[in-house]
């Protein structure tokens, strides 16, 4: 294990996106496995891999297939807030294939990625453990996501 990182989620600014991420992470939101079509309410992110890692740019995960095209069996609309930007390393943002195609895939930045503003929903930022993010390699597993309120 590379270690842990801690992130703050911006529930007050992008509530639908955070509710989706938290619901999948905790297993309270139903999702459909992209291969088996089985419906589940288990913690979605536990055990998934970071299938896309570009050094000096981002790490991306959230596909149960580990290939980059799987998701939870639904999409939801983009949710943008003017104060949330890709303006630092450690930004958590939804990966998508265009407007309105958010599902479960997310990425965490290594650098400022301002060209992604208005295209990908920012929903959190890393508070501790950016070194863990920066050292993550393609295929590394996300053991679990723990949600807590502080």
Regions found by a protein language model. Give the residues of each.
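Cyclophilin-like peptidyl-prolyl cis-trans isomerases
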Residues: 1-150
